[in-house]
Amino acid sequence: MLMITQTPEYGEDGVLVVGDVAVTPMPDAAQLAQIAVCTAQTAKSVAGFADPKVAMLSFSTLGSAKHEVVDKVIEATKLAKELDPALKVEGELQADAALVASVGQKKAPGSEIAGHANVLVFPCLEVGNIAYKLVQRLGNADAIGPILQGIARPVNDLSRGCSVDDIY
């Protein structure tokens, strides 16, 4: 999904590509890694990002918390790097560390991604769907998608809550 925000300092001039917000409820680490790689490819092909910077989101930043959900994101990050060694991906990162440069410097010093992410990968569908709808409704962002990935051509799935402006 493309999120066009009113905040140009985030993402790529206010544009973020996010996943998964519509398909896989509880992805395992391998599925999450594939989502990361596909979402970065979508960032290039659909959003025109020359340099996708992928943040694997969590409630923890680089070991600040210990939990099996965090372990899944760490494993998925490792697998994503194996699937695409050229991919710029880091995780686990909290959303503020991924998006806000000053926070990223504090929580993940030396990170190329922290504070500069333009692609966000959510740990599960529940988090992704809630996050995108909050950003869309409360942050007045335009949401384009969800875009189904991993098939021959991109497909857009419309939310029942979308407006005519969301379609066109």
Specify the residue positions occupied by each region the protein language model found.
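Anion-binding alpha/beta catalytic cores of soluble intermediary-metabolism enzymes, centered on
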Residues: 1-168
